From Swiss-Prot:
This is tRNA pseudouridine synthase B. NCBIfam families: TruB. The keyword Magnesium does not apply. It comes from Chlorobium phaeovibrioides (strain DSM 265 / 1930). Keywords: Isomerase, tRNA processing. The gene is truB. Its EC number is 5.4.99.25. The lineage of its organism: Bacteria, Pseudomonadati, Chlorobiota, Chlorobiia, Chlorobiales.
Length: 240
């Protein structure tokens, strides 16, 4: 039998955990992994997260445990910083690599200067419409549910966002490597689509990594397996 004792290292009121979400994991997969670590020790503890990442995105995900989950709302309004890889010269319905390419265009006439100028035009305060392939609600259904049925909703919700900076770090056609600093709720894949549109060749988000949420940096984040080991290490688990 497994016996668990709360050790001195287990925060009584919970804690924030900075994790580096792996590729192809959902945000809930990460939460479940940490929650199950507590269950292994016989302790039921609430675990939640702030700022969902798509499965194809990696990077900083902030988890909260115990009473700290009540403080997750304080993180929701923080700015986010992403490293994005944008594929120019093609589009997808989902604006990312989750759906098939269409509308292939030649990009050999583009140079880094043109891409940087187009990106800078997307900076500032603006209205952004939620993409069809998103979890936004529309008349009781998620937009992605409607998209899978071939339905296109033209009057989708729009909200004001701020693109603080849209820096093009380098261009290796057809790819543009960018660092984008945005306000809460901004869709980076919509910005990727808009960049391609501005350049007249189309574009979609080919890769995404979140590197910061407010002052929290991905360099301080743990791997999921290290977070699990940390949780188990905070509990004294013995085999009887």
């Amino acid at each position: 039998m497994v016996e668990m004792h709360e050790g001195a290292g287990l925060p009584e009121d919970g804690e924030f955990l900075l994790l580096d979400k792996p590729l192809d994991w959902t945000s809930f997969d990460v939460v479940a992994k940490v929650r199950n670590a507590y269950k292994r020790g016989g302790l039921k503890r609430k675990v939640g997260h702030s700022g969902t990442l798509d499965p194809k995105a990696t990077g900083l995900l902030i988890l909260a445990t115990g009473k700290k989950t009540r403080e997750l709302s304080t993180l929701e309004g923080l700015d986010k910083v992403y490293d994005a890889v944008i594929r120019l010269g093609a589009r997808t319905l989902s604006h990312d690599s989750e759906s098939e390419e269409y509308g292939l265009r030649d990009v050999t006439h583009l140079d880094e200067g043109a891409v940087k100028r187009a990106a800078s035009e997307l900076e500032g305060k603006r209205m952004q419409q939620a993409p069809m392939h998103s979890a936004t609600w529309h008349k009781g259904k998620r937009l992605y549910e409607l998209a899978r049925k071939g339905t296109v909703v033209t009057d989708r919700k729009s909200k004001e966002i701020v693109v603080h900076s849209f820096d093009v770090l380098r261009v290796e056609l057809p790819l543009a490597y960018c660092r984008i600093h945005v306000s809460k709720g901004a869709y980076i894949r919509v910005l990727a689509d808009e960049l391609g549109e501005a350049l007249g060749v189309g574009g979609y988000l080919a890769g995404l990594r979140r590197i910061a949420i407010g002052s929290y940096q991905v360099e301080s984040a743990m791997r999921v397996e290290d977070a699990v080991a940390r949780v188990l290490g905070q509990m004294q688990v013995t085999d009887q």
